[in-house]
């Protein structure tokens, strides 16, 4: 029994050695490829040059298809599975960067602010009495323009929605500056009867808010600021005109010519600023 086991073991050892010796090694493969690559140029019996596999002209002029030997390799690459949660190194580093966190938080805050301002503006404009109360409280085209730009920037609107927003804004600007058509006549014709009637119909709290807005405009104008400064403070041109009307400037045009001309200049500068 031991003798049979010994002979069987010798048989397996011999078989393994034969298989090992018959398999080409990496070194022999490299030597063979080097030997074949050195013979890149041969001549046939007719004196014509024969191109071998390593010749660059053959690779350019020969067939460009995939050989049958390479097909299984490409199929194996196609079937190879990659990790589902593989994250690029730069992407992971970018996500862990505190600066990017701060930028993302700042963007979210600006987005929330833009949405709140747009919501608040819609509520103001949706008043059943129209735009009158909003204008009396200091609503200006510059404020509407800022809200419009923020809404477009921080919201995902399509081209049609953006065009509609722009049209609504242009309509508001046209309606707003139509109130100054009589200002440029000689003598100026300013009609505040509709707004004055609207103020009388307001509640006590609403009238207090309108008076506060008018007093704020008076203090700013009396400070003697330039047009650029007044625009940066977003002083309402309509409330400025209403202030001069309340002070009786249009009742005596010759006496208040400088104040009226200053208002005309400010309206012109304001319109130019928002239409740039």
Curated annotation (Swiss-Prot):
Motif RxLR, residue numbers: 110-113
Domain of life the protein comes from: Eukaryota
Keyword list, A-Z: Host cell membrane, Host membrane, Membrane, Secreted, Signal, Virulence
Main location class: secreted
A single GO cellular-component term on record: membrane
Cell location: Secreted; Host cell membrane
Record carries keyword Transferase: no
Signal peptide positions on this chain: 1-27
General function of this protein: Secreted effector that partially suppresses the host cell death induced by cell death-inducing proteins.
Family: Belongs to the RxLR effector family.
Domain notes: Has the canonical translocation RxLR motif, but lacks the canonical EER motif, which characterizes most oomycete effectors identified so far.
Name of the featured protein: Secreted RxLR effector protein 85
